[in-house]
Amino acid sequence: PNDRPRPPTKGSPSDSPLFNRAVQGVYELGSTFKIFAAAQALEIGLANPSTLIDADAPMRWGKYTIKEFEGHNYGPLISLTDVIVKSSNVGTAHVALQIGEKRQQEFLKALGFFEPTKVELFEAPYAKPLTPKNWSDIHTITISYGHGLSASPLHLAAAYASLTNGGTKVTPTLVKQAYRIPGPRIVSEETSAAARA
């Protein structure tokens, strides 16, 4: 079953019915990433759910302008909870800048966004997320709201599970197990509970 022939037609491999989009496809995952910046801010003590965050749009960063979807302006200040509820790009960007480039990378790495998933599928080792070569402040900003880093839907599901299952790393598996051995701690149980709220 793993000696699959190449599709008989020309074109992109991702057009093949044999291409596993959930595992092999890497995409910019957009606003689904915002929860990671908020959770990290909670975890490292930068904010609590009611901390007021600058959400005045648009935000200028050097030659770049960060806008909200459909031109909304949620500012000048909204709570960290509302940054997630309203899906504020600007609010998330401000949170990410407080976290900083290095801590953001470490957190996303702990969640599994720098390596292929370890699921027991032939194609899994070939689906490594795409990350910036030179991670700058603008990458820190855009990655916080899901642009500039591409990962598979399975990466996202595993990261969400790790964040919301009590805060320990979840490794996807197809093997039925009598019980799950918890992975390394990613966030505290308190942060995990806040992310679920």
Predicted regions, residues:
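Beta-lactam-recognizing serine transpeptidase/beta-lactamase-like catalytic domain environment
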Residues: 1-31, 36-197
